[in-house]
Amino acid sequence: MSGPPFRRTAMRASVLFEQRTPLKVEDVELEAPRAGEVRVRMAASGVCHSCLHAADGSWTGVPVPIVLGDEGAGVVEAVGPGVQTLRAGDHVILSWAPTCGRCHYCVIGRPNLCEQRRPGQGVLPEGTSRMSLGGRPVYQYGHVATYASVTVVAESSAIAIDKNMPLDRAALIGCSVMTGVGAVINTAAVPPGASMAVFGVGGVGLNAVQGGAMVAAQPIIAVDVVGGKLESARQLGATHAIDASKEDPVAEIRRITRRGADFTFVAVGDARAVAQAAEALAPGGTCVVIGVPATGATVPLDVRPLVTGERVIRGSSYGSARTREDLPRLVELYRGGRLKIDELITRRYGLDEANEAFRALAAGELARGLIVF
């Protein structure tokens, strides 16, 4: 093993004991990394809607007790046997989508769909958690559990980056930036000059707007019900903003584009937004669904326009990421001034303020909140 040897250590983590109850900061025991795993001391973690949905019960079946957090960055402290790509001292972005490199999807170049991925089950790829409390297992949300001062993750969940990249900014690349930018560039492959609309411009949606600006989409239309978010979208590249609480977004998109949008992106977990985004498509257009609605949500759709207009509705999981290539590339885009991250960070919190971060996120007050350690 590289790095200081240990068998078990205590660290501080924000634990969800039951859905619909507040998080509690506890001293949680952390087991040493096993074969193919690494121990990471966290620098920062983003506050993501997926974690809010897990906590507030929107998503059912979340195992408890569990340490939430699915995007973050930190420094490798130790590595387990067989680790090849990392060593103690490396700066890493954590990814909730580990890859095995051997399954059907990894082999065909779609590692974000790896068959070993099980983020909702609260365990590492080999099937267990490295965290415990009073002898009871504590689950690790999204394979990484970033609401902890220290965590153990699979080697493929930790992507080494340039040490000159600030770790608090790097934390957001691990999910919201990758998911939003990747949906535009990887999943949809939006060409220059194509029109696009983004429904929901929170953390992920703002990054979809940024992705559109990177590929020179025109126009880029932001849709939300919160005025402050629409203003942020304009700062990040949106050419038009629609307040869906005051205007019909479908009618406005058609007015702006004259025929409907070539691409629409749904970056909010709302089935109604999916229906609107599909209706706003131009013939031949593609609706990309990024946000995951509450468990059991369904979308009423008029199928005829899909067929006669050859419109497409498809999902985008994690921005169709190839993490080992895409995450370092996003770091370089930030360092080169082409990707804005500082502007995404609305507020910083300590670990003991995670409940307040969730409240602010639910109230629409945050583009992205950041827990710093």
Region locations from a protein language model:
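C-terminal hydrophobic helical "lid"/dimerization subdomain
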Residues: 3-9, 255, 263, 275-279, ...
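Residues located in well-ordered beta-strands
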Residues: 12, 24, 29, 41, ...
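Glycine-rich beta-strand-centered segment in the early N-terminal region that forms part
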Residues: 31-45, 58-107, 112, 160-164
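Cysteine-cluster motifs in flexible loop/terminal segments that predominantly coordinate metals
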Residues: 96-150, 154-156
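Mid-domain Rossmann-like dinucleotide-binding core that forms the NAD(H)/NADP(H) cofactor-binding site
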Residues: 149-150, 156-158, 162-247, 251
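Glycine-rich phosphate-binding loop and adjacent beta-alpha segment
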Residues: 270-338, 366, 372-373
